[in-house]
Amino acid sequence: MLVVNVWGSWCAPCRVEAAALEQAATDLTDEGVQFVGIVIRDSLTSAQQFQEEQGVTYPSIFDPDSSTLLQVPSSLYPVATPTTYVVDHEGRVAVRILDKTTAPTLTGLVEDVLAEREAA
């Protein structure tokens, strides 16, 4: 399972949610959940500084011109920053959050998706 967060260092809600995402990533490690960020409309220096200051340890893809995001189907294209996706084991987007999130909310949603897989 994969959690993808679209963010930018210039984004105030991204700054608010950074610690929550890091906490969720830590809490879900034993479940085999991977986290990755996609940095948009940002400089590499600002993005790296943001990750260091916010204590973000999961990797991020540097996408200043949004070319990576252009690969996302238009129905799922992020219309807000931050946007967080939970991608299930079959590669389907199971959850899309169009605002900042909290660790309990994100962890709960991921656990729900994991439970659906186990029930199947």
Where are these regions (language model features)?
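Thiol/disulfide oxidoreductase modules built on the thioredoxin-like
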Residues: E52-V56, P64-A115
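Short active-site neighborhood of thiol/selenol oxidoreductases, capturing the structured segment around
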Residues: M1-R15, L21
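Structural microenvironment flanking redox-active thiols in thiol-disulfide oxidoreductases
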Residues: R15-Q54, D65-Q71
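Non-globular targeting/processing and membrane-anchoring segments
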Residues: R117-A120
